[in-house]
């Protein structure tokens, strides 16, 4: 991964990733205009949020640098295997594609339950700024303005509210409930800072669970380990898919059973290591 992603798209494989992306989706639009941005972001939302590939890379990479999946690998992974990535790889990839297409964009960090564990992009265009968040499946650019903005999705209404000091809060609205999801800080972060947070994300608790999510015309699919939730206009349906996990993920996400099985095996070994008694110590409590 080259250090020049945000000012030299060739350093980050941006041009090559863009060619693969355009060949797969053929989004409408021409130059760096708002409608083109919407088309690219909408097409890119087909890539699912999933940490299967990240889990596999965590346990198989030869070095910390090798575990970061670059833009070509992310797009090629979707074309070949219907995989996607987590917020860092999805953001890095989309940022490089947009930069290579002539858009001015930079990475930003967001706070969830912990600081700086989520990320997104800010795109600048015609004296306006837009939040683009491929890791939260919003599916379209959202203008960063002085007034709150609401976006309708198939599973909830997403609301972005200005706060203070270059911060915006993102909520989801379902029925009468408003849930805070994160606070995004729109000040640009350096390439080095972005990569550092990306590397640190491999140690987050979420990496101890298989997580997948994507939007469909019917609603929102969410998998955590062997629990599947489908959330749509008619409500929620929960299902335990432990007995046919690999088959169901293949059916719902198109991801090959071998990929799910490999991630599952790595986590199973990790959990067995937690239960194993320390060397030289009795196993009983």
Summary of predicted features, one role per range:
Residues 56-116:
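Extended, compositionally biased flexible segments
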Residues 148-149, 159-259:
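Acidic/His-leaning functional-site neighborhoods
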Residues 41, 50, 106, 122, ...:
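Residues in well-ordered beta-strands of folded domains
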Residues 70-81, 110-125, 129-131, 156-183:
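N-terminal short leaders/motifs
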Residues 92-161:
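Hydrophobic/aromatic-rich core segments of domains that either
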Residues 17, 93-94, 244-245:
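Short Gly/charged-rich anion-binding patches and loops
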Residues 2-26, 138, 211-217, 248-285:
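Non-catalytic peripheral regions of nucleotide-handling enzymes
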């Amino acid at each position: 991964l080259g250090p020049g992603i945000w000012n030299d798209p060739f350093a980050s494989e941006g041009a090559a990733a863009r060619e693969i992306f355009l060949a797969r989706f053929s989004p409408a639009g021409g130059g760096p205009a708002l409608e083109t941005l919407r088309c690219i972001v909408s097409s890119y939302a087909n890539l699912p949020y999933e940490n299967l590939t990240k889990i596999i890379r965590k346990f198989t990479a030869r070095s910390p640098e090798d575990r970061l999946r670059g833009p070509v690998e992310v797009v090629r992974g979707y074309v070949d295997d219907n995989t996607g990535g987590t917020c860092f790889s999805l953001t890095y990839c989309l940022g490089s594609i947009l930069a290579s297409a002539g858009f001015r964009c930079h990475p930003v960090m967001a706070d969830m339950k912990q600081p700086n564990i989520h990320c997104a992009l800010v795109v600048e265009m015609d004296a306006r700024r837009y939040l683009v968040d491929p890791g939260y499946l919003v599916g379209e650019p959202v203008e960063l303005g002085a007034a709150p903005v609401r976006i309708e999705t198939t599973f909830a209404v997403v609301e972005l509210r200005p706060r203070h000091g270059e911060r915006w809060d993102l909520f989801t609205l379902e029925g009468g409930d408003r849930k805070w999801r994160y606070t995004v800080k729109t000040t640009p972060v350096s390439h080095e800072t972005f990569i550092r947070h990306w590397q640190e994300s491999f140690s987050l608790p979420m990496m101890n669970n298989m997580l997948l999510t994507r939007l469909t015309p019917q609603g929102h699919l969410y998998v955590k380990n062997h629990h599947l939730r489908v959330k749509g206009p008619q409500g929620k349906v929960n299902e335990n898919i432990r007995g046919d996990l690999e088959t169901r993920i293949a059916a719902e996400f198109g991801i090959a059973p071998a990929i799910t099985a490999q991630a599952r095996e790595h986590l199973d070994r990790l959990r067995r290591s937690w239960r194993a008694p320390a060397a030289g110590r009795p196993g009983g409590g």
